Amino acid sequence: MKLYYIGILRPNKPEAVQLASASDLSSYSWFERSTVGQAFTFLAETVIPRTEPGQRQSVEENDYVGHAYLRSDGLGGVIITDQEYPVRVAYTLLNKVLEEYLTKHPKAEWENAKEASSKLAMPELEDYVKRYQDPHQADAIMRVQQELDETKIVLHKTIESVLARGERLDTLVDKSEALSQSSKIFFKQAKKTNSCCILM
């Protein structure tokens, strides 16, 4: 699971204006990073104008999925991940990032922006890209689900070992019953042998 890109955009026809973004291109060679980064920006700028206000959509392109959300106030966001990344976590992060951006930059600051500027930047996006690489740690519900899965595995192992121990106990009980029978037979034979000796 990999999170590659987070972008905050203002829709504009035919392409959106990217207001702030962050990406993790460490899995690409140094020579590929520029091209891949431009491709992610292009995907984000192309998807947001084609998203209806108040709607979410996920667009697959090769091995990537672009999760887009355009708020009804006109602020949009795109997260680009691999295909394994959980959709729910992507949209949860998108909501969180857009809310924080609006708190930091009211609509009046960005609604007429024609290009990205340092005063519209959001450096916290870099931290989100790093923190959300592992969606299990970043998302409380997924973390609880993972803990439940791990507990279930431990319980299964414990139950299996108890059952295995139970089977061994059953085997021991059977052996002890067989031992009891053989010891009873031995005792009777010994008694007969001893009684035979006493009569003589």
From Swiss-Prot:
The taxonomy runs: Eukaryota, Fungi, Dikarya, Ascomycota, Saccharomycotina
From the Swiss-Prot or TrEMBL record, give the protein name.
Synaptobrevin homolog YKT6
Alphabetic keyword roster: Cell membrane, Coiled coil, Lipoprotein, Membrane, Methylation, Palmitate, Prenylation
Question: Sites of the modification Cysteine methyl ester?
Answer: 197
Report the source organism: Yarrowia lipolytica (strain CLIB 122 / E 150)
Q: Identify where the record puts lipid attachment of type S-palmitoyl cysteine.
A: 196
Q: Does Cell membrane count among this protein's keywords?
A: yes
Q: Which gene holds the coding sequence for this protein?
A: YKT6
| Molecular functions per Gene Ontology | palmitoyltransferase activity; SNAP receptor activity
Name the lipidated positions (S-farnesyl cysteine): 197
Q: How does it sit in the membrane?
A: Lipid-anchor
